[in-house]
Amino acid sequence: MPYGTRYPTLAFHTGGVGESDDGMPPQPFETFCYDSALLQAKIENFNIVPYTSVLPKELFGNILPVDQCTKFFKHGAVLEVIMAGRGATVTDGTQAIATGVGICWGKDKNGELIRGWAVEYVEFFPTWIDDEIAESHAKMWLKKSLQHELDLRSISKHSEFQYFHNYINIIKKFGFCLTALGFLNFENAAPAVIQ
């Protein structure tokens, strides 16, 4: 029996950072720092598969903090994510990294929810920052990107934008920062029937 394409119906938001004095070329921050960031985000035991940023309306109201979902995690499973994550090397002049994910929902002419989008943000800073700076920069850039998603499609905003952010001030040689949405539950669209 055929089945249609999958779409997520339950998601969680999470974030993590990692740093290390050790790493392997050509991107030393991808080795130990990335693993540490995944551990802090509580998704270290998944096989991570990145998505682009289109959200079905079934996710509206169904994006939870990671701590509400960890009891359902399966070691070695595939986790599909929308992730803003990057690493940096202090010797390249980066002292801090901020990341974020923003979500917007669109409505039709009758005000009904129709669909959503997520956008990612990454910024490198030449000095240390604090949470206020990380949050304000993330919101500024994510808001601009979310509005672009709606304007590009001539769709009106259904509800307030949602923002999630994270940051790291790098003390060691290498650092990594990530903010992510992970998708846990799925349904299938109706299968295509070609006549």
Swiss-Prot record:
Alphabetical keyword list: Cytoplasm, Decarboxylase, Lyase, Pyruvate, Virulence
Main subcellular location of this protein, as a coarse class: cytoplasm
Cofactor: pyruvate
Top-level taxon of the source organism: Bacteria
Comment on bound cofactor: Binds 1 pyruvoyl group covalently per subunit.
GO molecular function, one term: arginine decarboxylase activity
Record-listed Pyruvic acid (Ser) modification sites: 53
GO BP terms in the entry: arginine catabolic process
GO CC, any one term: cytoplasm
Catalytically driven reaction(s): L-arginine + H(+) = agmatine + CO2
Positions bearing the site annotation: Cleavage (non-hydrolytic): 52-53
InterPro entries the UniProt entry points to: Pyr-dep_his/arg-deCO2ase (IPR016104), Pyr-dep_his/arg-deCO2ase_sand (IPR016105), Pyruvoyl-dep_arg_deCO2ase (IPR002724)
Compartment(s) where it occurs, according to its Swiss-Prot or TrEMBL record: Cytoplasm
Pfam families: PvlArgDC
Entry annotated with the keyword Nucleotidyltransferase: no
EC number: 4.1.1.19
Complex formation: Trimer of an alpha-beta dimer.
Functional description taken from the UniProt entry: Part of the AaxABC system, catalyzes the decarboxylation of L-arginine. The arginine uptake by the bacterium in the macrophage may be a virulence factor against the host innate immune response.
Family listed: Belongs to the pyruvoyl-dependent arginine decarboxylase family.
Protein name: Pyruvoyl-dependent arginine decarboxylase AaxB
